[in-house]
Amino acid sequence: MKNKYIEQFEAKQIEGKNVPDFRAGDTLKLAIRIKEGDKTRIQNFEGICIARRGNGVSETFIVRKIGANNVGVERIFPIYSESLESITVLRRGRVRRARLFYLRDRRGKAARIKELKK
């Protein structure tokens, strides 16, 4: 059981955030606030969510994209991070796993995920 003060603090952190419902296999577009010196700017990061773990304030997710020269780039984000401006779900993926770490070994068309039909 958590301390009531910790629970209040965590509830305050989660309070203002509007997080869409997404899971592993979904293609996400993230708007990340980056601070360089005294300036801040928004950088977009688009990729496939390959894992989601934890709960509450400490919940994180991993997004993987294939960058220049077919180099895979993975970033781990806390869901309730202040640096995340927005999370947009571009497409829903049809997968049968909660962790898609096998995509790390795949290249090209083999790394694609089928879209979920509604």
Curated annotation (Swiss-Prot):
One of its GO terms (cellular component) is cytosolic large ribosomal subunit. PROSITE patterns: RIBOSOMAL_L19 (PS01015). Keywords: Ribonucleoprotein, Ribosomal protein. GO terms for molecular function: structural constituent of ribosome. It holds the Pfam family Ribosomal_L19. One of its GO terms (biological process) is translation. The keyword Ribosomal protein applies. The keyword Ribosomal protein applies. Belongs to the bacterial ribosomal protein bL19 family. This protein is located at the 30S-50S ribosomal subunit interface and may play a role in the structure and function of the aminoacyl-tRNA binding site. This is Large ribosomal subunit protein bL19. It comes from Campylobacter jejuni subsp. jejuni serotype O:2 (strain ATCC 700819 / NCTC 11168). The gene is rplS.
